[in-house]
């Protein structure tokens, strides 16, 4: 399952944590939240592996898009400048993610 959903970087990140399941759960929730914010859900051209959850140098969670997902978003918003805001939290055993896509 994890090899179908997560990138190699995400797997490495999660596996190096004390409680990997918690980190996988938050990242999975973020991918689902992004797909819903995009307005499509996961489908043919929207792949989990093309939505990577990472952290910036300050530890803030970020979404990195690649492949068909990046192209789909740019086409949908007509190549306008956009921002993706991501919030992750958990209250064991629950994981929660909120994604907002804004563009000008």
Region spans (language model):
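Core catalytic alpha/beta fold that binds nucleotide/phospho-ligands
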Residues: 1-104
């Amino acid at each position: 399952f994890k090899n179908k959903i997560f990138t190699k970087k995400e797997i490495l990140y999660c596996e190096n944590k004390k409680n990997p399941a918690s980190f996988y759960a938050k990242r999975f929730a973020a991918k689902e939240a992004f797909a819903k914010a995009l307005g499509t859900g996961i489908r043919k051209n929207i792949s989990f592996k093309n939505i990577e959850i990472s952290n910036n140098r300050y530890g803030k969670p970020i979404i990195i898009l690649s492949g068909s997902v990046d192209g789909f978003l740019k086409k949908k918003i007509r190549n306008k400048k956009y921002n993706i805001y991501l919030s992750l939290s958990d209250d064991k055993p629950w994981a929660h993610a909120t994604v907002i896509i804004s563009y000008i």
